[in-house]
Curated annotation (Swiss-Prot):
Superkingdom of source: Bacteria
Keywords: ATP synthesis, ATP-binding, Cell inner membrane, Cell membrane, CF(1), Hydrogen ion transport, Ion transport, Membrane, Nucleotide-binding, Translocase, Transport
The name this protein goes by in its record: ATP synthase subunit alpha 2
Function: Produces ATP from ADP in the presence of a proton gradient across the membrane. The alpha chain is a regulatory subunit.
Membrane protein topology class: Peripheral membrane protein
Amino acid sequence: MQLNSNEISELIRERIVNFNLESEARNEGTIVSVSDGIITIHGLADVMQGEMLELPNNRFALALNLERHSVGAVVMGPYADLSEGMKVKGTGRILEVPVGNGLLGRVVNTLGQPIDGKGAVSFDRMDPVEVIAPGVIDRKSVDQPIQTGYKAVDSMVPIGRGQRELIIGDRQTGKTAMAIDAIINQKELGVKCIYVAIGQKASTIANVVRKLEEHGALENTIVVVASASEAAALQYLAPYAGCTMGEYFRDRGEDALIVYDDLSKQAVAYRQISLLLKRPPGREAFPGDVFYLHSRLLERAARVNEEYVERFTNGEVKGKTGSLTALPIIETQAGDVSAFVPTNVISITDGQIFLQTQLFNSGLRPAVDPGISVSRVGGAAQTKVIKKLSGGIRTALAQYRELAAFAQFSSDLDEATRRQLDHGEKVTELMKQKQYAPMTVAEQALAIFAAEKGYLTDVALNQISRFEEELMAFGRTNAQPLLDKINQSGDYNDEIESELHSLLKEFTALQS
């Protein structure tokens, strides 16, 4: 088929008329190298630190190195099919995650996408993962307790709402168990919880989720997962994503608790990314800003004042303070708390609960070492009844440890020393507690009262656990109004003291 000159000119005229003159400005670059999840991009202009870069097949990378002629970015997800020459687009957005009440009861990944097979997540809004922590003027002092349900913690190292309390110890010393029990204990107290699992085995995380579900605490909890098999970038970002989800509740005048399990693995993931980006290594091969990595995260846990909440909610919530309490976990190697990351996090947080392998293996669980465990601000927040009753607990345990070491070299001890050793031994036994069995304030007060007022003197050491169980059952059956009164008010006065004495006298009379 041949076209004549008229037809050709008509086709050209039609093309000219229909030519699309619209232009689109796109910030686009080209991948010049891919290795170990790190891509180097040439040609991208106006990229922000931490910006989301769009890759083929609906994937994203995070811009971390902004150099004169190229951008170094870390891929969030699989990268095996990426190759040189592929196009990368700038989005102009910092990473955001979904937040809101709809996330409670769900298991999500670092990006807030559901991984529990329960369908799409309902959320209120998208918030950036990196935000500046509230300033000094916006904060309120910590003076309300957060109950972990552990006698050893609530009596000796109390935690307040808005505090950062580090849980530190070797592997297999009960760090995760303590954090999970603290979450389970919040289900009746109206505190929303976020559990961030970083670099853990998927089977371990599945077990934690199952336990939370069994104890009715999952519906009050958001579980954020960046398992060991996921990209280092997702493990590095997971704590920030979880913190943003927790800040949603804090900024609306509610109380939230977040557990980072654990920040050692986040630091290792960040070290991996930094070394691949060719940043200069420092002590233990960590980059120079590893302190800032954790400080900017943990400073976001705070108790904010009424004015901050009112300003944030545009006047919708008035006269309420909000709080985000953080329980970061750090794993030590052979009990070395002087390593780089542990010392960093100890200096950032408001105290630490040190779990010791030796105590754990000797059967003392939770294996809290009262010698170096401390709460720097929690004392002001401690429930009055526990504060007044537990004053002698730490002293008794410290003196017992000292005397026990001394008694090994001496057989003839005077009566006062024997009594002190006996009391310390029984208090140590009383501090033991089963997993997934958090205690109310009243139950803790009753147990500590029995120890402090000498009701354990005639109880054999191997009978302490049975004595405590039977005492709790007796109290729930015969003195529930008293326990309710202590739980509601948290006060301790002469009337409550005499009622506790009456209860224990009645109970010990039945035992004899």
